Design a protein with these regions (language model features):
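C-terminal ends of transmembrane helices
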Residues: 2-8, 81-97, 145-156, 199-210, ...
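Predominantly late transmembrane helices and immediately cytosolic-facing juxtamembrane segments
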Residues: 2-9, 13, 214-218, 233-376, ...
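Hydrophobic core segments of alpha-helical transmembrane domains in multi-pass membrane transport
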Residues: 21-33, 79-85, 115-117, 197-202, ...
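Hydrophobic transmembrane alpha-helices of secondary-active transporters
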Residues: 54-60, 64, 69-93, 313-334, ...
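Structural signature of hydrophobic alpha-helical transmembrane segments
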Residues: 69-80, 128-142, 183-196, 234, ...
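Entry/N-cap segments of selected transmembrane alpha helices
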Residues: 90-118, 187, 191-196, 332-357, ...
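Functional cores that coordinate and move charged inorganic groups
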Residues: 148-260
C-alpha cells in the first residue's frame, strides 16, 4: 500500500468525521445545561441487555451494562480495534516500517506523553486525583488532522505524516496505559479462556482466513471474556486487530490475469431485438460476473477491507456518540475560576503546555544532534505550531478520565466533571492556537506534494 496515499486518505476521513464530532460535543454541552438535562443523564444510566435465556452478553460481573458502559466498553472496543488495524498497517507498510524513518515522531510522541504526565503529577502532588495522571498524554487524531485539513495543501506532507505517526504512537502509549493501570481484579479463568480463543484467532490469521464473520464472532467472544476478566475490554479490540491478515488471498498479478480471462470469455448471448435493452443475464454471464466479484474480494486484504468498512462507522457514529455521551458538562456547578485550580488546571496545563514542550523539544533535541533530519519543507516555526496541535487530547483523554474517576462515587463524579472542563478547554485552546500559528508561519501558496 502507498503510505502517502494512506496518509492523505486518513486526513480526509478524520477531517470530515471531525466536523460531526464538533457538532456532537456542542450538542452535549447544550443539552447538559438545558431543561432536559435530567433526561439526558438518566438515559445513559439505563440498563442494556442482549438476552439468550439466562445469558446476557452485555453483562459485567453479573450486572447488566448501562447505555454509558455499552458505549465506553463495547463501542469503544470497535474504535480501538480500528486503531489496532492502523497500527499494524503502519508497522508493516507505513511510517513505522523502519526505526530510522519513524524515529522523529516516535521520540516526539514519547516526549509528548511523558512531560504532560510529569506536569500533571507536579501540580497534583499530594492530591486525591493523581490516578488521572494519564489524562493529558493523548492526542486526538480526528481533531488534530481536522485542523491540518483546514489549511489544505499549505501544510507540507512531511508535517502531515509527522502528526499522523505521532498520534498513532500516542495511541500505542494510551493502549499500554489502559492495559497496565486500568485493569483490576484479574480473573485467571476468564483470561485463560480468552487466551485460548485468541490463539485460534492468531492461527486463523496466520493461515490466511479472510472471513470477516470468523474474526467478528471470535473477536466478540474475546471481548466478553476480557470484560469479565478484569482487563479493560477495549484491549481485546486491539489484540484481535493484530490477528487480521494483512496479505490478500489473491495476488494482484493473478487478479489481473483472472479478470482478463473472465472478460475475454464473457458469453455474448444472442437476443431477439435490441440486446442492449435486455435486463436479464444468462446463467453463464452471471457465473462469469460472480467469478470477477469473488476475485475482487480476494485481492483486497482483510486488514484493508475492514479499515475501509469501519472508517465511516467510527468517524460518523461511534466517536460522535462517545463524545455526545461523555462531553456533557453541567456548567452551573462549575466556576470558571476552577480552571486555574486542582485537576482542571493539571489537565489544562498538561495538554496545552506539556504536550507542546514534550513534542517540540524532543524533536528539537534529536534534530540538533543530527540523529534525524528536519521534516522536508518544514521550519522550526511550523514544527512548533504542529506540536501545539498535539495538545488536542479530546477523545482518548475523556476515555481515560472516565476510567480514572467513573467508579469513585460522588467524589469521582465531581473530579470527572472538572477533568472534562480541563480537557475541553485545553483541547480547544490548543486547536485554536495551533491553527493561528500554522496559518501565520506556513507559506501562503499551496505546497507542491
Amino acid at each position: 500500500m502507498d503510505s502517502l496515499y494512506a496518509i492523505k486518505k486518513s486526513i480526509k476521513n478524520y477531517a470530515s468525521g471531525g466536523n460531526v464530532l464538533i457538532v456532537a460535543t456542542l450538542l452535549a454541552f447544550i443539552i447538559a445545561n438545558s431543561p432536559i438535562a435530567d433526561m439526558y443523564f438518566s438515559w445513559w444510566a439505563q440498563p442494556i441487555s442482549l438476552q439468550l435465556g439466562d445469558f446476557n452478553l452485555f453483562s459485567h460481573n453479573g450486572h447488566p451494562m448501562t447505555v454509558m458502559e455499552f458505549i465506553n466498553d463495547a463501542l469503544m472496543a470497535i474504535f480501538f480495534f480500528s486503531i489496532g488495524l492502523e497500527i499494524k498497517r503502519e508497522v508493516l507498510v507505513g511510517e513505522l516500517t523502519s526505526i530510522k524513518q519513524a524515529l522523529l515522531p516516535i521520540v516526539a510522541a514519547i516526549g509528548g506523553m511523558v512531560i504532560p504526565v510529569l506536569l500533571f503529577m507536579y501540580i497534583g502532588r499530594g492530591s486525591d486525583f493523581l490516578r488521572g495522571s494519564a489524562i493529558p498524554m493523548a492526542t486526538d487524531i480526528a481533531f488534530s488532522l481536522g485542523v491540518l485539513a483546514m489549511l489544505g495543501k499549505r501544510v507540507p506532507i512531511s508535517l502531515k505524516i509527522f502528526l499522523t505517526t505521532l498520534a498513532v504512537v500516542d495511541d500505542i502509549g494510551g493502549i499500554l496505559v489502559i492495559a497496565i493501570f486500568y485493569s483490576s481484579h484479574i480473573s485467571v479463568t476468564y483470561l485463560f479462556y480468552a487466551a485460548g480463543i485468541f490463539l485460534i484467532l492468531w492461527l486463523g490469521g496466520r493461515a490466511g482466513i479472510n472471513s470477516k464473520m470468523f474474526y467478528f464472532i471470535l473477536g466478540g467472544v474475546v471481548w466478553f471474556l476480557f470484560l469479565n476478566s478484569g482487563i479493560h475490554p477495549t484491549i481485546a479490540g486491539v489484540l484481535v486487530a493484530f490477528c487480521i491478515p494483512a496479505k490478500p488471498v489473491l495476488a494482484t498479478t493473478r487478479f489481473i490475469s483472472t479478470i482478463r480471462d473472465e472478460i475475454a470469455n464473457f458469453p455474448q448471448e444472442q437476443f431477439h431485438g435490441d440486446s442492449d435493452s435486455s435486463i436479464m443475464l444468462s446463467k453463464d454471464q452471471i457465473n462469469c460476473l460472480k467469478s470477477i466479484e469473488s476475485a475482487s474480494d480476494k485481492v483486497i486484504s482483510p486488514l484493508q477491507d475492514l479499515e475501509d468498512t469501519l472508517h465511516p462507522v467510527i468517524n460518523y457514529l461511534i466517536i460522535p456518540l462517545f463524545a455526545f455521551a461523555n462531553a456533557g458538562i453541567v456548567l452551573s456547578g462549575i466556576e470558571l475560576s476552577s480552571l486555574f485550580t486542582g485537576i482542571s488546571l493539571a489537565v489544562f496545563v498538561g495538554l496545552l503546555f506539556g504536550k507542546f514542550v514534550g513534542i517540540f523539544f524532543s524533536s528539537w533535541l534529536i534534530i540538533k544532534l543530527k540523529i534525524v533530519p528536519m521534516p522536508t519543507h518544514s521550519t522550526w516555526k511550523s514544527l512548533a505550531s504542529v506540536s501545539v496541535l498535539g495538545g488536542i487530547g479530546f477523545t482518548v483523554s475523556l476515555f481515560i478520565a472516565n476510567l480514572s474517576f467513573g467508579n469513585m462515587g460522588p467524589e469521582g463524579i465531581e473530579l470527572l466533571e472538572h477533568a472534562k472542563l480541563g480537557i475541553v478547554m485545553g483541547s480547544l485552546v490548543s486547536g485554536i492556537l495551533g491553527y493561528i500559528l500554522l496559518n501565520l508561519f506556513l507559506p501562503k501558496q499551496q505546497e507542491v506534494e
